[in-house]
């Protein structure tokens, strides 16, 4: 059986902390306002794999009202979500992530993001695609107020 899931996340800029996207620290003058580390790419991907396995969403599994997830490393959240997906008998077919940001530029960091994601979801790097786009200076991402991200995941029954 093949199952597909979709995820979406958005965070505003505004915290004095590192900007983490796709498990990689991206040099920028500000970080995200978020309960965890705010990694929009990994949050969207976590939602996509949970959705594909009918396991709910990131907020159900890791509620932002629970202090144990305060400043949590999103790579750990993704790994735990993937562990639960594996328990249901699924492996990754492929994942595709689109980061929507006017700034900072993602291109120099995409290969590192792909490698970390592949490690976390136990698949080959060729099964992980990460790309970035802008909104041509339109909307909140265009005004550089934050970043949005979409992800899709294809799961295959093992």
Curated annotation (Swiss-Prot):
Name of the encoding gene: ispF
EC number per UniProt: 4.6.1.12
UniProt keyword list: Isoprene biosynthesis, Lyase, Metal-binding
Protein name: 2-C-methyl-D-erythritol 2,4-cyclodiphosphate synthase
Cofactor: a divalent metal cation
Cofactor binding note of this UniProt entry: Binds 1 divalent metal cation per subunit.
Pathway(s) served: Isoprenoid biosynthesis; isopentenyl diphosphate biosynthesis via DXP pathway; isopentenyl diphosphate from 1-deoxy-D-xylulose 5-phosphate: step 4/6
Superkingdom assignment: Bacteria
Class of the enzyme per the UniProt entry, highest EC level: lyase
The keyword Membrane is assigned to this record: no
């Amino acid at each position: 059986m093949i199952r597909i899931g979709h995820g979406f996340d958005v965070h505003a800029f505004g915290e004095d902390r590192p900007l983490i996207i796709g498990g990689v620290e991206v040099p920028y003058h500000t970080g995200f306002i978020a309960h965890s580390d705010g990694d929009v790419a990994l949050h969207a991907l976590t939602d996509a794999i949970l959705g594909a396995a009918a396991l709910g969403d990131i907020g159900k599994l890791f509620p932002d009202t629970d202090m144990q997830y305060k400043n949590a490393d999103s790579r750990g959240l993704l790994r735990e979500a993937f562990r639960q997906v594996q328990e249901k008998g699924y492996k990754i077919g492929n994942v595709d992530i689109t980061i929507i940001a006017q700034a900072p530029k993602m291109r120099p960091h995409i290969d590192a993001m792909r490698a970390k994601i592949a490690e976390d979801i136990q698949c080959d790097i060729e099964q992980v695609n990460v790309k970035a786009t802008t909104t041509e200076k339109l909307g909140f991402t265009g005004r550089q107020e934050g970043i949005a991200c979409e992800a899709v995941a294809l799961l295959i029954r093992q």
